[in-house]
Amino acid sequence: MIRRHLLVVLALWAAPGAAIAQDKGQVNVICSVQADWCGMIQTVFTRSTGIRVNLSMRGSGEALAQLTAERANPKTDLWFGGTGDPHLQAAEQDLTLEYRSPALGQLHVWAQQQAAQSRYRTVGIYSGPLGFGYNTELIARKKLPVPKRWADLLDPAYKGEIQVANPASSGTAYTMSATLGQLMGEEKAFEYLKALHKNISQYTRSGTGPIKAVARGETALSISFVHDGPTEAAQGFPVATITPDEGTGAEIGSMSIVKGARNLDNARRLYEWALTAQAQQFGAAARQFQLPSNKATPVDPRVPDFKRIRLIDYDYAKYGSAAERRRLIARWEKDVGALPR
């Protein structure tokens, strides 16, 4: 199915009779979206420009750790995707390069604000809300209610039935912790997380791991970005999603050029390409259903309808701070991660 989508997209991208471009060097990319989307970017960009894309797959937290470790000798040129908070933290730590794209005016306001907030060291490429994923067949078979609120997840009926990622490695889970802190206040949020721990079967490394486990029937529920639900449903899995009534946060998936990039010109070329409406269609073609940042990009009907979701006024500046991230993760590891299983 993905191969068929790729062939269609290639046909749309290439001019009639166009030949594959000649070799024009390379660009080294950390990719923090799902593998099918990363692979499509790699194939289409290489075929259309002649620039080889060398991919490294990392979750957002892992990507930030890699860039920090490589600060003195960067091996990465561009970081594509993943939650925006770590991109802001990379900008604050001078790991990424200031670059003002001439395409900024074509983007939604939230994508432009992400760029301005980082002093133009990152930019929004998509957005997606946080919520719950569930296996419809497993929920029915176990006679479990569908949760509608954050508070519902504390129901003892869900003991061992929920998966969520670890905020130290996953931007999804960090967004969850930050969202709860803003909804409840930090002290109540950590009391909530400690109570929720009793119902968690596993803390995964990757933010998409829990909803994939839901799809496979390994767990009934996940805390996930809700745009990941249609990805699994499109493959025939019995997955549905819901956003909590109390309110929820949303990520601004971002893209950054690494300071000290060895292939800077090619990184800028990929950056500009990724902001075009045409390139942003590859997300839906790869069955990834975030809201694209380019206003001219056609929106797939499976993309969550933000107008129907109660979104909090997420403080991207505060939770995009490197010090705040370190503090919150350290507290989570001490107060929640260290609890007995």
What are these model-predicted stretches?
Residues 32-39, 75-218:
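Extracytoplasmic ligand-binding site segments that recognize negatively charged/polar headgroups
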Residues 133-138, 178, 251-263, 282-283:
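A bilobed periplasmic-binding-protein/Venus flytrap-type ligand-binding module shared by bacterial periplasmic
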